[in-house]
Swiss-Prot record:
Cofactor binding annotation: Binds 1 Fe(2+) ion.
Protein name (database record): Peptide deformylase
Pfam families linked to this entry: Pep_deformylase
Database matches in Gene3D superfamilies: Peptide deformylase
Reactions performed catalytically: N-terminal N-formyl-L-methionyl-[peptide] + H2O = N-terminal L-methionyl-[peptide] + formate
Protein's organism: Pseudothermotoga lettingae (strain ATCC BAA-301 / DSM 14385 / NBRC 107922 / TMO)
GO biological process, one term: translation
MF terms in GO: metal ion binding; peptide deformylase activity
Alphabetized UniProt keyword annotations: Hydrolase, Iron, Metal-binding, Protein biosynthesis
Family designation: Belongs to the polypeptide deformylase family.
């Protein structure tokens, strides 16, 4: 089911997410919701907190759909890249963010199997962005304070919109 995206200002986006204890029907249902919502909003990645669930799960499709459960970044390259990022939870805001060019992640997939995988370039950026969501970090936290100040009116408007949003599920 396509879920509403939580916006900047929603407290769930600032909480450190809890580990998933086991992959069960509820977890599989959440994963389906994440993929459906991500595809419906033309995203390339989506973390559970973005749909109001404070669990350590995110999905990504960089040409290959993947599920990351309880991910840990175990390696970040010292080589960095700066590129523009946006976020469904911070709509219509795009800013340059510095990230590691390569990361290695240990995670559990939707079958409960432990996976260790390395990502480079754009895929590494997406993994780091979604992982940050599980830590309660948004990409706007990583931009210089002068840029945050420059876009403050936009950010304030998103927070106001978030406060007016009714997240109750409709049949």
């Amino acid at each position: 089911m396509v879920k509403k995206i939580r916006l900047l200002g929603d407290p769930v986006l600032r909480k450190k997410s809890k580990n998933v204890e086991r992959v069960d029907e509820t977890t599989i249902s959440l994963i389906k919701d994440l993929f459906e919502t991500m595809y419906a909003t033309d995203g390339i990645g989506l973390a559970a907190p973005q749909i109001g669930v404070s669990l350590r799960i995110f999905v990504m499709d960089d040409g290959k759909p993947r599920v990351f459960i309880n991910p840990e970044i175990i390696y970040k390259s010292e080589e960095k890249e700066i590129a523009e990022e946006g976020c469904l939870s911070v709509p219509e805001v795009f800013e340059d963010v510095e990230r590691s060019k390569e990361v290695t992640v240990r995670y559990m997939n939707e079958h409960g199997e432990e996976v260790e995988e390395s990502f480079v370039d754009y895929s590494a950026r997406v993994v780091q962005h979604e992982y940050d969501h599980l830590q309660g970090v948004l990409f706007i936290d990583l931009i210089p304070s002068s840029r945050r100040f420059a876009i403050r009116k936009k950010l304030i408007e998103i927070v106001r919109q978030s406060q007016k949003t009714d997240y109750a599920e409709r049949p």
